[in-house]
Swiss-Prot record:
Role of this protein: Catalyzes the condensation of (S)-aspartate-beta-semialdehyde [(S)-ASA] and pyruvate to 4-hydroxy-tetrahydrodipicolinate (HTPA).
Catalysed reactions listed for this entry: L-aspartate 4-semialdehyde + pyruvate = (2S,4S)-4-hydroxy-2,3,4,5-tetrahydrodipicolinate + H2O + H(+)
Keyword terms of this UniProt record: Amino-acid biosynthesis, Cytoplasm, Diaminopimelate biosynthesis, Lyase, Lysine biosynthesis, Schiff base
Protein name: 4-hydroxy-tetrahydrodipicolinate synthase
Gene Ontology MF term list: 4-hydroxy-tetrahydrodipicolinate synthase activity
Localization per record: Cytoplasm
Pfam family name, one: DHDPS
Active site (UniProt): 133 (proton donor/acceptor), 161 (schiff-base intermediate with substrate)
SUPFAM superfamilies per the UniProt record, alphabetical: Aldolase (SSF51569)
Length: 292
């Protein structure tokens, strides 16, 4: 259902801090033309933490509208209170999305049983496919493979975005989860190896600015042409790493603006513009990747 090169899309803003829907449409068209397989709207990279609930729902709905059915849109969701996560899912149910990407509850550090009950409650409220999202580096909680396996038995929990960077988990998840459960990397630097080990794709930050290369690389990998895919990945590796030289999405927004993909690279506080010392480092990575 979900595979290949999926972009964790940035949310562009105007200089006065409003969502820039003109740039958003431009981004959607850019990804359609580049062969991106799906878009995650308002996930971590889309600055979900600094959008109001109303803005979040509108950005997702407008992204679906701009896509015009040309590629599926996945809505970023999640909260550290289960009732809020359920409410969020209800609000997004009628926007035309193809799925939810639901991050584990953050800060309050639930147990594995708490994680299971949290996602089970979300799944009971919708028929739309749910993608689990494990990113312990941001949430301070790690969803263990055993918990993922339990959740994979729930009908509409269909996939996992694994942003741990731990490649040993691919085999564990493949062995423990039900047949057909989709594994997606959430780590650009290890994404190709993740697919080589049995994953089905990557939800990518790099894809925001190197969409055609990421699509080609993932499609080659899924066809078993790993040597050709590795050649592209090697060219992008410095970019994969340097897009995290400061907190994401700070570097990728700066790069997208530099490339003319968005009207400006503003973020909402507490996120700030890319620092002056980091700018030549990201610029050099763009040059090495041969995309700007």
């Amino acid at each position: 259902m979900f595979s290949g090169s999926i972009v964790a899309l940035i949310t562009p803003f105007t200089p006065d801090g409003e969502v820039d829907y003109i740039s958003l449409k431009k981004l959607v068209d850019f990804h359609v033309d580049a062969g991106t397989d799906a878009i995650v709207s308002v996930g971590t990279t889309g600055e979900s933490a600094t959008l109001t609930v109303e803005e979040h729902v509108k950005v997702v709905a407008k992204t679906v509208e701009f896509a015009e059915g040309r590629l599926p849109i996945i809505a970023g969701t999640g909260a550290n209170a289960t009732h809020e996560a359920v409410t969020f899912s209800r609000l997004l149910n009628n926007t035309g999305i193809a799925g939810y990407l639901s991050v584990t509850p953050y800060y309050n550090k639930p147990t594995q049983e708490g994680l299971f009950l949290h996602y089970n409650a979300i799944a009971q409220e919708t028929d739309i496919p749910v993608i689990l999202y494990n990113v312990p580096g941001r949430t301070a909680v790690d969803m263990r493979p055993e918990t993922v396996a339990r959740l994979s038995e729930i009908k509409n929990i269909v996939a996992l975005k694994d942003a741990t960077g731990d490649l040993s988990r691919v085999a564990k998840h493949r062995e423990m989860c039900k047949e057909g459960f989709v594994l997606l990397s959430g780590d650009d630097a290890t994404g190709l190896e993740f697919v080589k080990l049995g994953g089905q794709g990557v939800i990518s930050v790099t894809n925001n600015i190197a969409a055609a290369d990421m699509a080609k690389m993932m499609h080659l990998a899924l066809d078993g042409k790993f040597d050709e895919a590795a050649s592209i990945n090697q060219r992008l590796m410095t970019l994969h790493k340097n897009l995290f030289i400061e907190s994401s999405p700070i570097p990728v927004k700066w790069a997208a603006h530099k490339m003319g993909l968005i009207a400006n690279g503003d973020l909402r506080l507490p996120l700030t513009q890319l620092s002056e010392p980091a700018r030549p480092i990201v610029a050099q990575a763009l040059s090495e990747a041969c995309i700007y």
